[in-house]
Amino acid sequence: MRRVIELTALDRVDGNAVEALLDRALGSDRHGRTAYRLRAGTAAIPALSLAALDNGALVATIQCWPVVFSADDGRVVPITLLGPVAVEPGRQRDGIGRMLMAACLDAAARAGLDDAVMLIGDPEYYERFFGFTAERTAGWRLPGPVERHRLLARGAGVP
């Protein structure tokens, strides 16, 4: 029997369940990571923050955040920060994360928020399936450490 994964708005899911999933998938030490520092003090974009449910049980989440890039020449460029993408450890490699990514990027396009999207993640995976690269991020300064090859972006508006 084939499982049917239901996607829903993240704000329709219990916040404690989301936090517990994030702990299991990413570790309880995740709050000190650079991506968390980047989005500190901002609210997630509701239309781009989704949950995946399997028979009502939370199995994965994705969130996006509005951030800005301040260029050395004074330009301020709005960027959509994608992540975290969290999948229940026992369900990883089931295609749920890829399904969430596709739905999130489609929603970003519909909302006009796909001109500049960034994330920190596995370069082979995110380039192969979604076109993210580190080509334009080498000179970016972030509020914490990051492995440069994992700082990825896509979109015509990426500085």
Predicted regions and their residues:
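Short amphipathic alpha-helix that is part of the acyltransferase structural core
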Residues: 1-37, 43-59, 74, 151-152, ...
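Conserved acetyl-CoA-binding loop-helix of GNAT-fold acetyltransferases
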Residues: 82, 87, 93-106, 119
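Conserved active-site alpha-helix within GNAT-family acetyltransferase domains
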Residues: 110-147
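A conserved beta-turn-beta hairpin within the catalytic core of GNAT-like acetyltransferases
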Residues: 68-82, 92, 113
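Conserved beta-strand in the GNAT
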Residues: 49-51, 57-68, 78-86
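Conserved glycine-rich acetyl-CoA-binding loop
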Residues: 57, 75, 88-99, 111
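A short beta-turn/loop motif at secondary-structure boundaries
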Residues: 40-44, 142-145
